Amino acid sequence: MDDSKIFDVAIVGYGPVGAALAILLGQQGHRVVVLERYTEPYPLPRAVHYDHEVARILQSCGVAERCATIVEPAEVYEFQNAEGKALVRFGRRGNGPSGWPQSSMFSQPELEAVLFARVDEIPRIEVRRGWAVSDLADDGDHVVVRSAAGSVRARYVVGGDGANSTVRSL
């Protein structure tokens, strides 16, 4: 561990949430390290929808124009049973109060590629892949984040590592 380097924020998890948070913090001048357990992005979508509020956040990240090429407004939703019979159908037409479509469909790998490209444009963000966090230790004015790959120090740690969050369990 480089004892002279303390990041402002360590973000555990590099999906859309971790990447967006890193961008927003980095744009404000904070030194950010993102720790991701996987060495490569997962190639299949998990999330496929966001609403107008998320579109507003992506605009704040500086990726709205890039996202416009990979999203499609979703104006009607229909949920069906196994036989294909409609159980419920409702609309989400038009723009929400933020000025963006109320609902947009996307492919998570495409959205992540857009966000990762933006992260690469911000020099105050460092991404470390292959870092499976195993421990957090509070050292008073900072936290030590440990993994088999090493350890880092940060003033704050944020868990952006999904539903089965390691950070939450520590």
PLM region spans:
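Short hydrophobic core segments
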Residues: V12, V152-G162
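A conserved short coil-to-beta-strand element within the FAD-binding core of flavoproteins
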Residues: R129-V143
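Beta1/beta-strand and adjacent pyrophosphate-binding region of the FAD-binding site
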Residues: D2-V17
